Amino acid sequence: MDDLKSIIGKVATGAPLSREQAASAFDSMMSGEATPSQMGALLMALRVRGETVEEITGAVSVMRAKMLRVDAPANAVDIVGTGGDGSGSVNVSTCASFIVAGAGVPVAKHGNRALSSRSGAADVLAALGVKIDLKPDQVGRCIREAGIGFMFAPAHHPAMKNVGPTRVELATRTIFNLLGPLSNPAGVKRQMVGVFSRQWVEPLAQVLKNLGSGAAWVVHGSDGLDEITLTGPTFVAALENGHIRTFEISPEEAGLGLCDSEGLKGGDAAANAVALQSVLDGLPSPYRDVALLNAAAALVVAGRAKSLKEGVAIGKDSLDSGAAAGRLKQLIAVSNS
């Protein structure tokens, strides 16, 4: 197996790494064997040249091997974004997760604190009263009893502590911004992943295919959102039955109206928590509609809906019946017990 120095030398020439070489390099970094200089050199060389599907696949395989796993039902789904889109939007995937859970599909939500906004999934859930820093068996209990559990990334990826300081010092996006959403500790086979750039939509779908995902949508809004947007089209790469299909979707085809970007602007964790609760309480808003649209796509990925329109109808029922709000109440109770 190539040593780290020779791998860094190879990347420095612009040559791609094999999946095995990438896995070897990331194992060195995450096990603490690599020096900060070596980590910085490799991460920036990959970033400047552009990471390949094989390199990301190798890196994710190491991250998955080192994570602390959570037991979840085989049909569990995740709705997750890379963050880093710079939009400062409301917490779309978190709200959509409660809608999906309210529709009877188990959700194993993976997330972290804010990356570029003022409120990430962990921030808003903590503001709502959910205990986020749980052990894997406690998260599994949440999924079983509340129909939804939250896996706080730092608690499930302890090996990341070895690369954390280097990432902070680099202060720029690296391959690790792509790895987290692909490394769900519950090992979900069905997920919706939002990405910060259109260039990653199809490659990340290919990575998920390489790693054995059953069904997935990788999405990027035309306005830059790492979610399905309500302001215009969204680019999608869908993994279905071992094949990847690319297409665009619009809110109109799901029976929803367009909004401007101001309608999706968020605030800090406290403000976003109030906004999320108001959606679960049934109040109409662009936030409700964008959460419904993302939930609808997740319901399609989960096999619960055949189309976005049907997914929106199921999502509306989850909200209007109080089921989605009930899932949040249950998660607060179970996570704190």
Curated annotation (Swiss-Prot):
Binding-site positions, anthranilate 2: 167
Pathway terms, separated by semicolons: Amino-acid biosynthesis; L-tryptophan biosynthesis; L-tryptophan from chorismate: step 2/5
Cofactors: Mg(2+)
Glycosyltransferase in keyword set: yes
Primary enzyme class: transferase
Cofactor note: Binds 2 magnesium ions per monomer.
Gene Ontology cellular component terms for the protein in this record: cytosol
UniProt EC number: 2.4.2.18
Record carries keyword Nuclease: no
Catalytic activity: N-(5-phospho-beta-D-ribosyl)anthranilate + diphosphate = 5-phospho-alpha-D-ribose 1-diphosphate + anthranilate
Binding residue positions for Mg(2+) 2: 226-227
Pfam family, one: Glycos_transf_3
GO molecular-function terms, A-Z: anthranilate phosphoribosyltransferase activity; magnesium ion binding
Chain sites annotated for binding Mg(2+) 1: 93, 227
InterPro entries in the cross-refs: Anthranilate_Pribosyl_Tfrase, Glycosyl_Trfase_fam3, Glycosyl_Trfase_fam3_N_dom, Glycosyl_Trfase_fam3_N_dom_sf, Nuc_phospho_transferase
Any GO BP: L-tryptophan biosynthetic process
Keyword terms of this UniProt record: Amino-acid biosynthesis, Aromatic amino acid biosynthesis, Glycosyltransferase, Magnesium, Metal-binding, Transferase, Tryptophan biosynthesis
Function: Catalyzes the transfer of the phosphoribosyl group of 5-phosphorylribose-1-pyrophosphate (PRPP) to anthranilate to yield N-(5'-phosphoribosyl)-anthranilate (PRA).
Quaternary context: Homodimer.
Protein family per UniProt: Belongs to the anthranilate phosphoribosyltransferase family.
Protein name (record): Anthranilate phosphoribosyltransferase
Organism: Bradyrhizobium sp. (strain ORS 278)
Lineage: Bacteria, Pseudomonadati, Pseudomonadota, Alphaproteobacteria, Hyphomicrobiales
Gene of this entry: trpD
